[in-house]
A protein has these predicted regions:
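Domain-edge interaction signal
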Residues: 1-171
């Protein structure tokens, strides 16, 4: 939950996608494919279902729609923070910090979708230009063609470009 945006299956998918792209091995089994709202893995819903009850609510029946709000259980925040500090390896904590930096400025659902979609295209076509990326976004879905303004795509492309050397094989 950030800047008025709710936690959701959609947001969890985008964060898991970027953690995987940043090299998080515990997410290596998630298979992301190009779907209506960008890269998506059905496995993320299973992870959320496993966390349901103690860390969040809204995934009781695993029927939450992509943008349906999930409620984070803030009473567990201290436990989660302690887990991150004591149980994650330093490189995993570094990935979390990089995820925060990478998504800074892209926290709305639309901007997360744009960032992840542009990255997915760049991953699939490593030498793709900005112009070709804009064109591919336009053929992904009619919704993306209408919603993703050229400037939004360029902003995401340039943002990802800044991280290309720091993130390694992410881009």
């Amino acid at each position: 939950e950030s800047q008025g945006e709710n936690a959701s299956v959609f947001v969890a998918n985008k964060l898991a996608y970027f953690l995987q792209r940043l090299g998080e091995r515990s997410f290596s089994r998630l298979k992301f494919t190009a779907q209506s709202y960008g890269p998506y893995s059905p496995g993320v819903a299973h992870v959320l279902h496993a966390l349901n009850g103690k860390y969040l609510t809204g995934m009781e029946q695993m029927e939450a729609k992509p943008f349906e709000p999930l409620t984070l259980q803030y009473a567990a925040a201290k436990e989660v923070s302690e887990y991150v500090k004591t149980r994650l390896r330093p490189e995993q904590r570094d990935r979390l910090r990089m995820l925060i930096t990478l998504t800074d400025g892209f926290l709305s659902t639309l901007s997360l979708e744009i960032l992840a979609s542009v990255d997915y295209i760049r991953k699939e076509y490593p030498q793709i230009s900005k112009e070709e990326t804009i064109s591919r976004i336009g053929t992904w879905t009619e919704r993306k063609k209408e919603l993703f303004k050229e400037q939004y795509i360029i902003t995401a492309y340039d943002h990802l470009e800044k991280y290309a050397t720091r993130i390694g094989d992410m881009i």
